[in-house]
Amino acid sequence: MQELVIRRPDDWHLHLRDGGVLRGVIGDTSRHFARAIVMPNLVPPVVTSADAAAYRQRILAAIPAGDRFEPLMTLYLTEGTDPDDVEAGYGSGLVKAVKLYPAGATTNSHSGVRDIAKAMPVLERMAEIGMPLCVHGEVTTPEVDIFDREAVFIETVLDPLRRRLPDLRITMEHVTTKDGVDYIKEHAGNLAGSITTHHLIINRNAILVGGIKPHYYCLPVAKRERHRQALRAAAVSGDVRFFLGTDSAPHVDPLKECACGCAGIYTSVNTMSCLAHVFEEEGALDRLEAFTSLNGPAWYGLPANEETITLRKANEPVRYPAKIETEAGLITVFDPLFPLYWAVA
């Protein structure tokens, strides 16, 4: 049996939701991951440091006994966000980053930014104090094709923002295109990118071929195969600017399996198994630790975890549940469409 020992991983982009869903999903992350950047797009969103402190307490209360897990809190950027509150939250260590959602870009993003100029006082303060900005990198203007949203965002929003505030540390979250990968590679400095598990595995065919597959629908939407290959190359390269952010996003089945289904794929259950498969397929198992456990902490100015986990490759496929039960209902687990042989021991 093949074994791989790596430092305990972190998840640099995670949705935990709240209430019954939070209590149902938190263990799937805390079992294997030491830390996670927790997204603030609740209803209502986490917009102040006080909101973040209260949400953090709800997360801590939901962690299964015996698990050691640290939620890293973020604030939801609005056009009315108070720079002083942001600085105070960051200075206290409570808040690790601010999240920019263009209004309407994804789940619970209607409170997001419509005019980035109105958020400039906060962004200028963040640049001064070295606080990271996590960006959902898509435009939402109706004339832009959904498959082009990321490339247009880079050209019309991200690049001008970086020119105006070159000291602002920006995480381009859930990169989905070759355009995004190339932009990060070509622009040294305060820029890095997270990559999801599922975007390394599926392209847009998974959603559309043979019928609509709602459990492969996410935002940013999966793209063409050439983009998936670019993401794989970046993830397995060892480049310190790329790291894991699963964007694991639980929705109960009725919210996915309907006429207007929610965007999000739930990967927390089997992410490490999927990633071991991908990195083995690419001949890069020796660089899995960098992607999951080293590059992210380095970017966020945190020490790498001292604890380790062991991944073992079995002779027979590992069985994962197709769904998990929560107080709010069933949530479908990501199916990578191939058998998984690696599992955390």
Swiss-Prot record:
Q: Does the keyword Zinc apply?
A: yes
The residues annotated as the active site are: D247
What protein name is recorded for this chain?
Answer: Dihydroorotase
Classify the source by domain of life. Bacteria
The gene it comes from is: pyrC
UniProt keyword Zinc present: yes
Q: What CDD domains does this protein map onto?
A: DHOase
Q: What is its EC number?
A: 3.5.2.3
Catalytic reactions on record: (S)-dihydroorotate + H2O = N-carbamoyl-L-aspartate + H(+)
Role of this protein: Catalyzes the reversible cyclization of carbamoyl aspartate to dihydroorotate.
Instruction: State the UniProt keywords alphabetically.
Output: Hydrolase, Metal-binding, Pyrimidine biosynthesis, Zinc
- Biological processes annotated in GO: 'de novo' pyrimidine nucleobase biosynthetic process; 'de novo' UMP biosynthetic process
Top EC category: hydrolase
Q: Which residues carry this modification: N6-carboxylysine?
A: K99
As to how many cofactors bind and how, the note says:
Binds 2 Zn(2+) ions per subunit.
List residues binding substrate. H15, L16, R17, N41, H136, L219, H251, A263
An annotated GO cellular component of this protein is: cytosol
GO: which molecular function terms? dihydroorotase activity; zinc ion binding
Which pathway does the protein contribute to?
A: Pyrimidine metabolism; UMP biosynthesis via de novo pathway; (S)-dihydroorotate from bicarbonate: step 3/3
